[in-house]
Every structure is written in structure tokens, then in C-alpha cells.
Amino acid sequence: MPVSRARRALLSLFILLSFTLSSCDGFSLEDIIPDLGSDPSDDVLVEVTFYVQIPLNTPEGEEIYLSTLDEVTGLGVNASAHPMEPSLGDANIDQGLVYQTTLTVPQHTIIKYRYTRQNQYAVIEHTESDEQVRYRMAQANNPLEIRDVVSKWSDTSYYWPEPGRISGIISDTTTGEPVPGMLVIGGGVQAFTTASGSYMLPGLPPGVHNLVVYAPDGSYHEIQQGAEVASQANTEANLAITPREYVDVTFLVTVPIGTPENSVRLVGNLYQLGNTYGNLPGGMNTIPSRMPKLTFAGGNQYGIIVALPVGTEIRYKYTLGDGFWNAEHTLDGSFNMRRFIVPDHSIQLNDEVLSWKSGTKDSITFDLWTPDHTPSGEEVFIQFNPYGWTTPLPMTEVAPNHWVFILFSPFDILSDLTYRYCREGECGIADDAATAGLFPAGRGVTPSAEPQYIADTVEDWAWLESAPFEYNTPLPVIRTRGEDFVTGVELMSGSKPADSVQITSAIPEVVNLNGGWIVLTPTWSLTHHNPPVIEPDPDQDPLWIDLNTMTMTALSQGLHVAIHPQPHFPEAVENWWLNAPLDFSWWNSWFDQYHAYAIHFAETAQIQGAEMLVLGGDWIAPALPGGKLADGTPSGVPADSELRWIEIMNDVNARFSGTIAWEMSLPAGDPAPEYFEHVDQVHLNWDPGFVINPDTTLEELVTIGNLSLDGEVHDFWSSWLRPGGKDLVLRIQYPSVSGWNPDCSTADDGPCYPISAFSDPAPVVVDYETGFTEQALAYQAFLSTAPNQDWVSGIISRGYYAPAILHDKSISIHGKPAEKLLRDWFLSLK
């Protein structure tokens, strides 16, 4: 029954009082945690002297600084600048001035830093490829000297001799096996080791660079050494790292009176403490969904036990938001940061948060009511915009559809700000309809010296229907297929670090679809165009740990796992290819990059226990033998491309023992390529050409589907697959729109959008209205035709958007009528 606004106000007051008062029940950590004593502080201090050589084209008369960075609060929001002095006698001035400074830090400190120049603004150092240096790293185990070279500044050109590079393999000292997912840093360039333990740091100016290998989760001891790089040369640095043991660390914290209940989290510098090692919007680097949440322990205390690696430096703080919003502060208003070295025995840390506030401004309480059709089990987040939209923060549900968030800080460095609400942290996609989109104005608020209470209501959510769907689509006639018949869903690729957490959390929903298979779609990014570079970018691609967590979770819940790697292009894939040089040198680089990409995911699938690896895809069509660009012109792929693909697939087979599948669309009548000898299955993007309007009948679609199957699809199977005994799995997809016409062959066909236009969440396609019945009808036709063909070996629904239910125009079936139809059909096959 709807609740009146007056009744909501009274209910809100009652709940808010109980929300901020300490509870008298709950368990005490004293009942389960022995008094182990606090960890003694590491009082030994060491001096670290930094020498940096700057390029000759550095503007004169400007101060040079070493900026130490705080990845817990945010690299972009809490740096400390240390002035440097010229060290004229240390190097040949004709090669660039050398500056120096000395820091005194606790022993075993990991220093994250970069160099800046100060004029009217702070000018940050950049790499040779003109990317901002994220940070360099140094470990202060003993007094030492660090020597660095600045490649260039953001406002200058590269002025050194031709750069060189550092490359190598990182292995485990105890097993000799390669170690994937390690962060390797040198010369301001960062890379993560591949599944084979390999890494490469390109674009380094000649000179000595500090090289550090660091485990994002602290699972291995760090290694640090100098590496000399010569112009146009490779410095090989193969290093062995030692794994760490783990001990239990108990965090027990006393919080201020008035702390909202069950909102205290632990945020720190390791992966398992919320660090993404990527650059999030607003200069942040941590996500609440990965931060450990503390348990109420009576009084004003909260606690948690976390297994941490011995010898690791832990930087941490307590927070009611993330490392920036609502984090703990000292009494003078500064961000508080705690530090300790994990000992070789279990310990208990007894901490006290002095204040959640900073400055003289008081808290703001956001009291939100959401509509009754908000999906059960989904969380509501609030997102703030002080100078740009920052990481969304989870609100606390105090009653059904009633959410609260109290903002305490950091008001000392903020004035006006705007905010908005969204579901499941998917701001920009699953928004409050009043503030929807990537760049909305938002709702406004100005912090003040007095506490503020803001009562908000989300009247409607973007891309979420208020009325329940009518599920009246009849189930197709079931034809029993054997256990080898492949059924499942392929996930839509993520585009931000939090997506990996949400995908992992959504795996039980995939299990409930009864399909049996989940196709994970990890990504690498095309970060450079000439020469082409494809590599993991933690800003948008999952780390090794992320993919391993997703795979292990799916396997543990009884799913078969396939890994289907995908690219992240900086622009439309067609334009990327059209704008590429496509000369012989460029093609050599492209094949080298794709080879490394394919090998990495083959080894990843083998190590992580996936049963299938899917390669190919329409995005590589210009690189296949006889490849063409989107405008129909030849791509200029080398004449020996067939041999290059054979080599790639040979190497993939040598590294992965499971099923190897190839994704593709129907070819243009060409014979099967020779590299198909190394493929076990083909996953065909089946498009029978359905055009579905409100008056379209199932019988019409079944006729069209059967014509496609009996004609072009059967011809493809009989000529490409049957001779080699290879299986054909059909990938099915249809957008949730009415009247979509996939045929763009004539100008009279009206608006034309390829299926790729609907392959991302919440696509903006104004020419079509949503059509959920149409999507379900397409699925009914798919399932009424394809499984009846003996030579079809499986059905995969592609584009399942896991993070949240969206009633959008995309191909995702999550939360739409087609999902129920597919779930029931999968179940009936069992």
C-alpha cells in the first residue's frame, strides 16, 4: 500500500534516530577474538634520496617537485609536494639538469610518487607516448638512492634520444612457475604481467630507472632494482619473487557517537581492501563494493578479521563511504591514514576514529524513498559531483524502498556540490529518471555550519518499467537434446572496475537461468593506434584477480565456464580500422599484439580452469585472409596472413587443453581457412533477418528462421564444419525494440542500426521505441527452430547485462520477458 508523504516524514524521523544511535544488541568481538595485543609501531626511520634528470626542453625558472601520492584517498586529491634542488655536479648538464630531494620515512614504506613542475599550474610528467605518469614506486627497506629520468612533461615534447624498453618474465621462487597479474613499474610506465609472467615497459628514455615488481594483493614480496636502458635497446629483467604467508589481523575500532549503524568499512592500499589500481572518475581509486564491511561489536565498536600477507605494508583508514568521501579525519580536519607492517603472527589492532568530519561544516542527511517497483535485492547508490562525478556510494536501506546516507566530509575542501541516485552503482545507466544520463545537472546542495536534512523521492527509474510484464509467450515445443548440447548466456563486457564485483555477485542469477554455461567476456584495451597496442587497462579492464574470482565463483556454483576475450576500442571499431595506417610494419605489430593477446587468454583459461576458450569475432575481420574494411575496400592484410593465423591457433592449442571455439558471422562464400583445423566449435552470430512489428506473428518468424537454417546456415555448416566434424553453436540476440530492420541494403529501408548499436547497456537509439514483446517473440522463434536441427549443437544468448536489471533497448534479456522464456526453455531441456 502506498505511504503518504506525511507518514513518510514521521517514519523517516523514527528510523533516522535509530539509524544513528548505538544499538544495545549484537555480538561482542571479545567472545570470538582472543586478546592478541596491538602491533608495535615500526619506529625505524630511513632516508631515501631521489635524483631525477629532467629533459633539456624543460622551461627555465620553474620549481621541480617530487609529489608523493595517496592511492587510498585518491591519487588526484591528496598529493604532497616536496621541493627539489638542483644537483649540478651529478650529471652532464648538456644531458639535462638533475634535481634531488631526501625523504625520511618509516622502514619498509612503499612510496608512490611522480614528478611535477610548478608554473601557474602543476605540470605533471608524462611518458614518451604522452600518457600521464600514474605513479612511480620505491621501497624503503634501508637508506637508499633512487635515480629517475623524466621522459617529458605534459606541455613539452619528447626530447631524449630514441627510447628503449625493459622486458622480462616474473616467476615464483618456490615453483619456478610464471606469476600473472603482478604490477611492474619502471620509468613511470606500468604494466601487469600476463598469464605467462611476461611484461614489457616500452618508451623509456636512456638512463637508469628504478624497477619494482609489486603484487596488487600483497601475495608476493616486492622486488626493487635499478635497470639501465639504452636507446633503441631492450633491457631484459627476468625476476623471481617469493610468495608470502597469511595471518589473521583483527581490526577493532571505536567510532564517534552518532555513527550510522552498519556503515563502517575498511579501505586500504591492497586489492582486497578496495584498491582498483585504476583511475576512477574524480581522481579516486577505490570502490566500496570491494572494501571489507565491519560488524557491530557492541557499544561504539566495530570489528572484522582479515587475512593479510606477512611483511606487507598496509595503509588503511576507516570510512562510511570510500577513501575520499566520509573517510575518517584527524581533529584538525586532515585525512587520517594508518600504517603497519603485517607481522608473522596474528594480531589485533585497536583503533579509534576521532571524527568523520572535516572543517566547520556539519553533516547532510539524504533521506530517500524509491518507487515500489524498485527490484528487490538491488542496492541504491548516491553519487556526488564536486567538480565532476565521482565513485557512487552505497546507501543504507532502513526499510523497504527507504534509503539513507549521511554525508560528513570532506566539506573543508568543497563548497557547492550536486548529487544523484542510481541503482547498483550504475550511475549514468540505471539512474533516477530525473537525473539520467552521463552528464546530468543533478540535484544541488550547499554544505553549511548547521546539520541539513534532505528528503528526496525517486519518482521513477530510467530504463525500468513500473508495471510488471505479462508473461504470456508460450514455451516452444521441446525437443530433447543430449547433455552435450550447449546452452547458456554470454555476459555483456564490463567497462569499469566495479563491474567485476557486480558480475561475480550476479552469478547466482545466471545459475537460476538453468543454462549450464556462462561465457565470461574479459577485455583488453586498444591503447595505441600506431603502432597498435592491445593490453590490460585497469581503468576499464578486469585484473587477473578479478577474472579468477569470476571464474572460480562460476565453477563453484556448478556452471561450465567459457572465456571469450573482447577488445575495448577508443572509438567505433569500423573507424579504428579505417584510420589505421595498415602498412606492412603496422600489420606486423598488429599480429604480434593479437598473438600475445590470444596466448594470454589461452593460458588464463588453462590456469583458471575454464572449459572453453572463444576467439575470433567480427572485430578482427579486416585481419583475416582477404580482409576488407567497413567501406568495402581491401584492408591490405599481408599475403601470408593465413600462415600467421595458423601459427596463432597452433600456439593457442599448445597452451589450452579445453574446447577452442571461433566466433564469426556468416562468411561471404569463401572456403574454410586452414587455421580452422585448430578449432573445435564455431559460435555463429545467427541473424535470420527478423523484422518484428506489433502485428508480426510467430508463424511468420518461424518460416523466416527455418529458411535461414535450411539455406545459408546449413550451407555454411556443410561446407565449413561437417568435413572436420566441428560443432556449430548459434549465438542468438535481438534488441528490445519494435520495428528494427537489420537489413540496410537500400536507402528506403528507413533508420538502420547494426546489432552492435544495441550491444551496450542503455543505448541511445531514438528512432525505435522499446519492444520487450518483440524481443521475446524473436527468442520464441529462435527456440522454435534452431534446436530442431540435428547439426546445431548449442544455443548461447549473448549480451546478458549482469550488474542491474535494465528495461532498455539493448540485446540484454536480464529482467525482460525473454529471460523468463529462456529460463523455462533451459529448464525443460533438462
Describe these PLM feature segments:
Residues 51-60, 159-180, 251-261, 365-376:
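Structural motif
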Residues 475-479, 747-757, 767, 773-779, ...:
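Aromatic-rich peripheral "rim/lid" segments of glycoside hydrolase catalytic domains that contact
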Residues 601-602, 608-617, 664-707, 726-727, ...:
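Aromatic- and acid-rich polysaccharide-binding/catalytic face
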Residues 506-508, 512, 520-572, 601, ...:
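Aromatic-lined substrate-binding rim segments of carbohydrate-active enzymes
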Residues 473-481, 513-532, 545-629, 802:
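Substrate-binding cleft and catalytic face of glycoside hydrolase catalytic domains
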Residues 564-567, 612-618, 637, 642-670, ...:
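Aromatic-lined carbohydrate-recognition surfaces of secreted/lumenal glycan-active proteins
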Residues 118-160, 216-238, 244, 320-360, ...:
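Structured interaction patches on ligand/partner-binding surfaces of diverse proteins
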Residues 56-108, 118-138, 189, 257-311, ...:
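Aromatic-rich carbohydrate-binding modules that target alpha-glucans
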